Swiss-Prot record:
Binding site for UMP: G56, D76, I137, G138, S139, P140, Y141, F142, S143, T144
Pfam families given in the database record: AA_kinase (PF00696)
The gene coding this protein: pyrH
Modulation of this protein's activity: Allosterically activated by GTP. Inhibited by UTP.
Enzyme Commission code: 2.7.4.22
Stored InterPro entries: AceGlu_kinase-like_sf, Asp/Glu/Uridylate_kinase, Uridylate_kinase, Uridylate_kinase_bac
Catalytic activity: UMP + ATP = UDP + ADP
Protein name: Uridylate kinase
Subcellular location: Cytoplasm
Chain coiled-coil ranges: none
Keywords assigned: Allosteric enzyme, ATP-binding, Cytoplasm, Kinase, Nucleotide-binding, Pyrimidine biosynthesis, Transferase
Broad EC category: transferase
């Protein structure tokens, strides 16, 4: 069947670190990473320009470490290194399925990755390469959600795809705890902030709103969902400035 034109031509996919851990929930499961890489490769083969930001929660969490007494700045830098580990593993899996991939880091580590340079990242995308952004924004106190929103703005992405584990969108309550929870199909960025819906942290939400970047929250565990989102199927929750506010 002939595909329609894509809704989004340049996307930034935000993956949690836990997405790479598989059923174990911690560490890196190579088979899981390879499965995700194949999903991304399928979309990339259709001519979609793709960047990635991957969290580091499968390897390290800075806030609990800080609460236990570790210096918060050092804890956050440790987490940034975790995101680079995840980026390198994902890059290898993408290379193995035939996708030319570059890792760029906000903290210089030129033996393993390029430094983040916006112009170079744009050229990679234009040449059909996938770019993975590691090490957050290079500063403590900023989440990888904020990294995703900032890098999406810098590369002029059409949308941020928030790939969730087993969660098919945004609800007014936790659907695992409340059977009456209702899923939102559409929201404005202002809705998200005003309703306190923690899709991403407030800094990331504001960045997305101010730069008019669509945000799509969807379940990544179902095969083909990334492609469905790119081609405009309403399978999750779309957050945009251009949707009439919901009551």
């Amino acid at each position: 069947m002939k595909m329609a034109n894509p809704k989004y031509k340049r996307i930034l996919i935000k993956l949690s670190g836990e997405a790479l851990a598989g059923e174990r929930g911690v560490g890196i499961d190579i088979q899981t990473v390879q499965t995700i890489a194949k999903e991304i490769q399928e979309v990339h083969s259709l001519g979609i320009e793709i960047a990635l930001v991957i969290g580091g929660g499968n390897l390290w969490r800075g806030e609990p470490a800080a609460e236990a007494g570790m210096d918060r700045v050092q804890a956050d830098y440790t987490g940034m290194l975790g995101t680079v580990m995840n980026a390198l593993v994902m890059a290898d899996s993408l290379q193995q399925v035939g996708v030319d991939t570059r890792v760029q880091t906000a903290i210089a580590m030129q033996q393993v990755a390029e430094p983040y340079v916006r112009g170079r990242a744009l050229r990679h995308l234009e040449k059909g390469r996938i770019v993975i952004f590691g090490a957050g924004i290079g500063s403590p106190y900023f989440s990888t959600d904020t990294t995703a929103a900032l890098r999406a703005a810098e590369i002029e992405a059409d949308a941020i795809l928030m790939a969730k584990n087993g969660v098919d969108g945004v609800y007014n309550a936790d659907p695992k705890k409340d059977k009456t929870a209702v899923k939102f199909e559409e929201l404005t960025h202002r809705d998200v902030i005003n309703k306190g819906l923690r899709i991403m942290d407030s800094t990331a939400s504001t960045l997305s709103m101010d730069n008019d970047i669509d945000l799509v929250v969807f379940n990544m565990n179902q095969s083909g969902n990334i492609k469905r989102v790119v081609f405009g199927e309403n399978i999750g929750t779309t957050v945009s400035n251009n949707i009439e506010e919901k009551e």
